[in-house]
C-alpha cells in the first residue's frame, strides 16, 4: 500500500473515531486492535491489513467500502 494511501486511511479512521467521541484506547477496546497499532495507523506509519480494517470498521459501525470511499 502506498504511503499516501496509508496516511489517508489513517486519517479516515481518525475522523470516524472522533465522530464517535472516541479516543484511541476506546477504539482499541471496541475493536480488539492494540492501541499502539491504532496509533500507528492514525499516523499513517503502519500498513493496515484486511483483518485489522474489518475489526476497526465493525467497531466504528461502518463498512470497509464506506470507510475507503474517496481514498
Regions found by a protein language model. Give the residues of each.
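Recognition helix of helix-turn-helix/homeodomain-like DNA-binding domains
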Residues: 32-47
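DNA major-groove recognition helix of helix-turn-helix/homeodomain DNA-binding modules
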Residues: 51-66
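Short basic helix-loop element that most often maps to the first helix and adjoining turn
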Residues: 11-30, 55
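A detector for short, charged/polar N-terminal pre-domain segments
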Residues: 1-8
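Short, charged recognition helix plus adjacent turn
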Residues: 2, 58, 68-71
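Amphipathic alpha-helical segments that mediate coupling or scaffolding at interfaces
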Residues: 16, 41, 67-70
Amino acid at each position: 500500500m502506498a504511503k499516501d494511501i496509508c496516511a489517508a486511511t489513517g486519517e479516515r479512521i481518525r475522523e470516524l473515531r472522533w465522530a464517535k467521541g472516541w479516543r484511541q484506547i476506546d477504539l482499541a477496546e471496541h475493536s480488539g486492535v492494540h492501541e499502539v497499532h491504532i496509533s500507528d495507523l492514525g499516523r499513517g506509519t503502519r500498513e493496515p491489513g484486511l483483518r485489522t480494517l474489518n475489526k476497526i470498521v465493525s467497531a466504528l459501525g461502518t463498512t470497509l467500502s464506506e470507510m475507503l470511499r474517496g481514498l
